Each structure stands twice: as structure tokens, then as C-alpha cells.
Amino acid sequence: MTALHFISGLPRSGSTLLAALLRQNPRFQAGMSGPLAGLFDALVAQMSARNEFSVFLDDAKRERILRGLFDSYYSDCAAEVVFDTNRGWCARMPAIAQLFPDAKVIACVRELPWVIDSIERLVQRNVFSPSSIFNYSTGGTVYTRANDVASQDGMVGGPYDALKQACYGAQRDRLLVVQYETLTAEPVKIMHAIYEFIGEPVFEHDFGRVDYDVTEFDERAGTPGLHTVRGAVKAEPRDTVLPPDLFNRFVHDAFWREPDKIPDGLQVV
């Protein structure tokens, strides 16, 4: 593994589509969200003072162990450039900067009402398959589900707070915010921006045929279609399945679309 970068950001915002595109480059390895962020957090916790043997660890050892986690996980990967995907990485920017000084983070974002809409659409599409997103619960309404995912520890609320932390934090110069709306409407523009951001030669991608299928994982999670990417990259306007009052609750949350709220050094494309 010669280069490591990260894909993070909001759910239902194009991270799997972006990974599917990056995979077209034979030099790159990318995929859906993986286990490394969870393993990383578990290791950090176990090396803390709550473990009585932590007295044998200093920060230099901790850093070597954490780097070793990535080296071990990707030891069988022949790609020259690896992109590890997880929504948790935005909250780990200080650690990433210290462990991997050359690593960049791509944060995929989307207007919040459409993130909530996308999740609800999946639920309604799979009415006979309760989703792991809601602990396989069969009850609730569109309102309770939206409140659940938008909560501070929810599937959307947690990553949203982490995104804001990354965008306004000291490491924002190594962060590229990629808007789903631009990715689907102008994929060439997005990919060129990414190649420039990570300092790699541009590759000509096939935007007319993008495939990435992890059906087994999605079905096990009770949410078929959660990560499936097929066909051409294109914007597909549609009506929302959210009630108007619920949709309007989130319309002003896309801070990255307001120039006066974008701090110096943060790139948004």
C-alpha cells in the first residue's frame, strides 16, 4: 500500500457510487463502508487508561499499533492507492493527520431532506424486510424514523455533526467536500477535482456503465439495494416521499452550499 485516503461524510450521499467509480481505475482500491473505523476506535479504547496494562504503552507505540492495523488489513491488497470508507472518519481527522500525514479525506454530502428521503424510500420499498437501520423494528412512522436517524447519535445526525467538526476543524485543508448533486450531474468535474486533490494522474472513467453489487451484505442488513450501484451516472429528479412539514425541517442544514459559511481552506465541489 503506497497511498491511503479516506471516504467519509453523510449516508445516502454517493460514497458507494464514488467508490464504484474509483474502482474502475486499476491502480485504486475502494468499496462500501468497512470495519476499519470500528476496529480503530476499539483499539484506541483498549489502549487507554481503562486498561491497567496501558502503562506499558506510550503514544509512539500506540501510533505504531494503529498504523499496523491498516497495514495488516490491506496487506493482501495490490492497489497502489487505497480508499477506506466509513462515516466515522470525519470525526477522526486529527488522528488521521498524525498517523498518515499525506492522507486526504473525501466527504460525500447531500441536501439533508433528500438523505432522509432516501432512507425512508428504502424502508418503504422493502416493507416485508425490517431493516437493521431501525433495529429490525416493524413499527413507527416516517416521523419516528426521521427523528431516529436525525438524532445526535443517529445514522444521519452523528455523521452530520462529525462533518461539521471536520469542515471547521484545523485539518480542513486535507478535506474535500463532494456534493451528491454535482457527482450525479457533473461526474467528470468531480473526478477531476478528486484526482487533483489527491495528486494522482487523471483516469478516464466510464460514467455510462458503473457496477458495484454487495447484495449479500444488504440482504443480511434487511435493506436490499442499500449499496447497489448499476447503470449510468445521472441525476434523477423525483418527488419526495416525506410529508412537507418533515421535509422542510431539514432544508436549511446544507451549510456547505452557503459561501459565507465555508471557512478558508475548505474545498467544496
Predicted regions and their residues:
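Short beta-strand segments
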Residues: 7-9, 82-85, 107-109, 177-179
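Glycine-rich phosphate-binding loop used to anchor ATP phosphates in small-molecule kinases
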Residues: 69-95
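Short aromatic-enriched loop/helix-cap "lid" or pocket-rim segments at secondary-structure transitions
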Residues: 41-46, 96, 117-121, 128, ...
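PAPS-dependent sulfotransferases, especially Golgi type II membrane carbohydrate sulfotransferases
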Residues: 1-5, 149-169, 173, 188-189, ...
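PAPS-dependent sulfotransferase catalytic domain
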Residues: 60-76, 117-197
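PAPS-dependent sulfotransferase catalytic core
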Residues: 1-69, 76, 124, 213-221, ...
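Conserved phosphate-donor/acceptor-positioning beta-strand/loop module used by diverse small-molecule
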Residues: 85-88, 96-122
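PAPS/PAP-binding and catalytic site of the sulfotransferase fold
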Residues: 14-28, 96-100, 120, 177-202
